[in-house]
């Protein structure tokens, strides 16, 4: 998988007779007589899509997945989207997965899509949401989540291989509940781009397919035919589009073998468990619980939230001005990768919400270089930020003062797409769905499984999700999870004539928010190991002292109007804990041999409690990481292909701590 900080090399395009030509691959993106008609003939008709769509069940649970090997101009996606909305059942959902090693720059994409005015409605939305071209996975949602695009930027084999659970053909088939329904093999000519048509890639494609999965490609070369046949596909040669003599269609019958070199023990995933009903019970009504409830409800699930307090958005999610910003670093780790993916996705989610609700601002935020260590960290990002100025810009003292609206003692890192969101109000919006029921004042002390459903406080559901923050490890089943409580207190002070000029959040040792209702929120204390949210006057003074260091030239009020304390839940590696919950004793038995060789191949999935999931430990960056994590988890529960690479699924897996303990010893 590509490192998030090794930049993508975008497409080098030469326009010839008003057609885009790839200088990297010495080939055209589409011919003068091609474009929409070619896509319709080769991919839509070649996969018999319209007839298949019209026969789909009419419910929200049905997801039809199309995967493509070369995104290019995005025209195949846009045409598929338009036809889906015309021919598919209204409640069915389309998941489109694509990949590009050299994606088009936004300006080139706009120029390409101007050629097809019949796709202008879809093209306008794609252009609006077109991601920052950082390596890895980008997940975009359209039409109220009815159309989703997972766009992977990087090497096609590496990207699709990360969608596999383990890479062993036999075990993969046992574990997989989600498959690609149709493939668009669309890349430059095999003679120009051999990696797009390799045996290794076609083997991965086979492992992501099921019996009856179809393939269509404009190419009819012997290389492609042989690779498809070897991977288990039955080939049919058809007349090609326009002057082209032939094209290929195929359907998946059976895979014969897979390489033993690329197998990965699937300790992060469980064997499939039948769900008789599409009902889910969520313990916890904070941001995590409300986001996962919303994601499941959009998929047609009936959801019940059990919340201990009197309403949602209390506890650690009660901050009325929670700050959204990424943790940017040159250090290449699952943490930085997950933070970047999460920030980009969350930013897209909140921008859409802000079109309809007044619950915050995304006008940027400023991370001040308040000491030498922070300054060095920010300076290390110079080269990367030159390539991706949309994510951040280093600014000097004068620029930081101009951006913030007040006098500041230093420069810093300006993140233009960040800002703040009212978390409690966001929770209310997320659960405003007829499929979501809320039960408040309901303390959960035990969970029970009756061999069919989970039962909590006499309420029964087929799926149970524990999203109750620092209390997530209070149960027998979860007591091995190393969750730590971190208390934080926010102080609210009166705004002054001078302080009201502050336009964006400022972050240093602490942080301060722009005035809202004539007051500023200043925070936050950080008390590790404290699990009770009692208010503390000393923390108010700590926050005020930090505020003075953030902007010493400003006359800040010392009048404390209010204060609030909440408990953050965090893991030892500061990544969230999201996914199926393993049975600790059985897990240690199954994977005991990892102690002698951490990379040993063990042909067993994780022994997990049936249909029991954890969604917790988001720490102080829940606003940033929860949207992506919960969307992935909802897809897993609903039997959909992952929107995250395997490495990141493992990085947030509840089983990672048990595995680490086996390898390193007690």
UniProtKB/Swiss-Prot annotation:
- According to the record, the residues making up region (FAD-dependent cmnm(5)s(2)U34 oxidoreductase) are 283-666
* Annotated keywords: Cytoplasm, FAD, Flavoprotein, Methyltransferase, Multifunctional enzyme, Oxidoreductase, S-adenosyl-L-methionine, Transferase, tRNA processing
- Show the GO MF annotations: flavin adenine dinucleotide binding; oxidoreductase activity, acting on the CH-NH group of donors; tRNA (5-methylaminomethyl-2-thiouridylate)(34)-methyltransferase activity
Q: What InterPro entries would the database entry show?
A: FAD-dep_OxRdtase (IPR006076), FAD/NAD-bd_sf (IPR036188), MnmC-like_methylTransf (IPR008471), SAM-dependent_MTases_sf (IPR029063), tRNA_MAMT_biosynth_bifunc_MnmC (IPR023032), tRNA_MNMC2 (IPR047785), tRNA_S-uridine_synth_MnmC_C (IPR017610)
Compartments, as annotated in UniProt? Cytoplasm
Mind telling me which Pfam families this protein's record contains?
A: DAO, Methyltransf_30
* Obligatory cofactor(s): FAD
Q: Does the keyword Ribonucleoprotein apply?
A: no
Q: Where is this region: tRNA (mnm(5)s(2)U34)-methyltransferase?
A: 1-253
The catalytic activity, as recorded, is: 5-aminomethyl-2-thiouridine(34) in tRNA + S-adenosyl-L-methionine = 5-methylaminomethyl-2-thiouridine(34) in tRNA + S-adenosyl-L-homocysteine + H(+)
Q: Its GO biological process terms?
A: methylation; tRNA wobble base modification
Q: What GO CC annotations are associated with the protein?
A: cytoplasm
- EC number annotated for this UniProt entry: 2.1.1.61, 1.5.-.-
Q: What is its main location?
A: cytoplasm
Which SUPFAM superfamilies does UniProt cross-reference here?
Answer: FAD-linked reductases, C-terminal domain, FAD/NAD(P)-binding domain
User: Into which family does the record put it?
Assistant: In the N-terminal section; belongs to the methyltransferase superfamily. tRNA (mnm(5)s(2)U34)-methyltransferase family. In the C-terminal section; belongs to the DAO family.
**Which PANTHER family does this one have?**
SARCOSINE DEHYDROGENASE-RELATED (PTHR13847), TRNA 5-METHYLAMINOMETHYL-2-THIOURIDINE BIOSYNTHESIS BIFUNCTIONAL PROTEIN MNMC (PTHR13847:SF283)
Purpose of the protein: Catalyzes the last two steps in the biosynthesis of 5-methylaminomethyl-2-thiouridine (mnm(5)s(2)U) at the wobble position (U34) in tRNA. Catalyzes the FAD-dependent demodification of cmnm(5)s(2)U34 to nm(5)s(2)U34, followed by the transfer of a methyl group from S-adenosyl-L-methionine to nm(5)s(2)U34, to form mnm(5)s(2)U34.
What is this protein's name?
tRNA 5-methylaminomethyl-2-thiouridine biosynthesis bifunctional protein MnmC
Q: Which organism is it from?
A: Legionella pneumophila (strain Corby)
Q: What is the lineage of its organism?
A: Bacteria, Pseudomonadati, Pseudomonadota, Gammaproteobacteria, Legionellales
């Amino acid at each position: 998988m590509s490192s998030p900080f090794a930049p993508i090399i975008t497409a080098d395009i030469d326009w010839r007779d008003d057609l885009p030509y790839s200088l990297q691959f010495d080939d055209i993106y589409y011919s003068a007589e091609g474009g929409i008609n070619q896509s319709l003939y080769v991919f839509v008709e070649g996969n018999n899509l319209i007839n298949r769509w019209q026969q789909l069940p009419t419910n929200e649970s049905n997801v039809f997945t199309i995967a493509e090997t070369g995104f290019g101009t995005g025209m195949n996606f846009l045409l598929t989207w338009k036809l889906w909305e015309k021919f598919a059942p209204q409640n069915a959902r389309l998941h489109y997965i694509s990949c590009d090693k050299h994606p088009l720059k936004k300006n080139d994409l706009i120029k390409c899509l101007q050629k097809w005015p019949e796709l202008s409605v879809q093209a306008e939305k794609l252009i609006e949401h077109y991601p920052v071209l950082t390596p890895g996975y980008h997940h975009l949602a359209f039409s109220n989540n009815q159309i989703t695009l997972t766009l992977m930027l990087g090497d096609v084999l590496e990207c699709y291989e990360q969608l596999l659970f383990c890479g062993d053909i036999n075990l993969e088939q046992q574990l997989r509940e989600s498959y690609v329904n149709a493939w668009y093999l669309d890349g430059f000519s095999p003679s120009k781009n051999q990696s797009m048509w390799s045996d290794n890639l076609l083997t991965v494609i086979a492992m992501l397919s099921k019996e009856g999965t179809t393939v269509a490609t404009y190419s009819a070369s012997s290389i492609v035919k042989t690779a498809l046949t070897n991977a288990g596909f039955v080939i049919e040669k058809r007349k090609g589009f326009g002057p082209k003599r032939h094209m290929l269609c195929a359907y998946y019958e059976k895979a014969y073998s897979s390489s033993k070199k690329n197998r990965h023990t699937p300790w992060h995933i469980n064997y499939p468990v039948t769900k008789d009903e599409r009902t889910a019970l969520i313990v916890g009504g904070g941001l995590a619980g409300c986001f996962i409830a919303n994601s499941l409800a959009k998929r047609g699930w009936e959801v019940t939230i059990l919340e201990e307090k009197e309403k949602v958005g209390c506890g650690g999610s009660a901050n009325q001005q929670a700050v959204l910003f990424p943790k940017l670093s040159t250090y290449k780790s699952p943490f930085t990768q997950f933070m970047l993916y999460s920030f980009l996705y969350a930013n897209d989610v909140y921008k859409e919400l802000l079109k309809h609700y007044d619950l915050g601002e995304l006008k940027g935020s400023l991370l001040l270089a308040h000491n030498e260590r922070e300054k060095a960290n920010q300076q290390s990002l110079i080269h990367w930020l030159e390539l991706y100025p949309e994510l951040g810009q280093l600014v000097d003292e004068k620029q930081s003062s101009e951006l913030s609206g007040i006098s500041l003692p230093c420069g810093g890192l300006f993140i233009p797409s960040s800002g703040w969101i009212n978390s409690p109000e966001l929770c209310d919006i997320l659960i405003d769905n007829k499929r979501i029921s809320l039960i408040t004042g309901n303390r959960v002390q035990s969970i029970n499984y009756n061999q069919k459903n989970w039962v909590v406080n006499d309420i029964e559901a087929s799926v149970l999700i524990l999203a109750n923050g620092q209390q997530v490890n209070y149960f027998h089943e979860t007591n091995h999870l190393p969750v730590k409580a971190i208390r934080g207190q926010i102080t609210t002070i009166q705004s002054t004539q001078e302080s009201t000029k502050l336009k964006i959040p400022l972050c240093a040792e602490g942080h301060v928010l722009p005035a809202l209702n004539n007051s500023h929120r200043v925070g936050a204390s950080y008390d590790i190991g404290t699990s009770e949210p009692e208010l503390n006057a000393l923390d108010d003074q700590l926050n005020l002292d930090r505020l003075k260091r953030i902007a010493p030239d400003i006359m800040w009020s010392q009048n404390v109007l209010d204060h609030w304390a909440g408990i953050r839940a965090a893991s030892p590696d500061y990544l969230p804990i999201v996914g199926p919950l393993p049975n600790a004793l059985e897990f240690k038995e199954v994977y005991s041999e990892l102690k002698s060789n951490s990379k040993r191949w063990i042909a067993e999935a994780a022994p997990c409690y049936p249909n029991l999931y954890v969604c917790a430990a988001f720490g102080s960056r829940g606003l940033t990481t929860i949207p992506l994590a919960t969307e992935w988890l909802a897809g897993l529960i609903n039997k959909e292909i992952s929107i995250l690479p395997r490495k990141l699924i493992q990085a947030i897996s509840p089983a990672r701590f048990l595995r680490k303990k086996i390898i390193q010893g007690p």
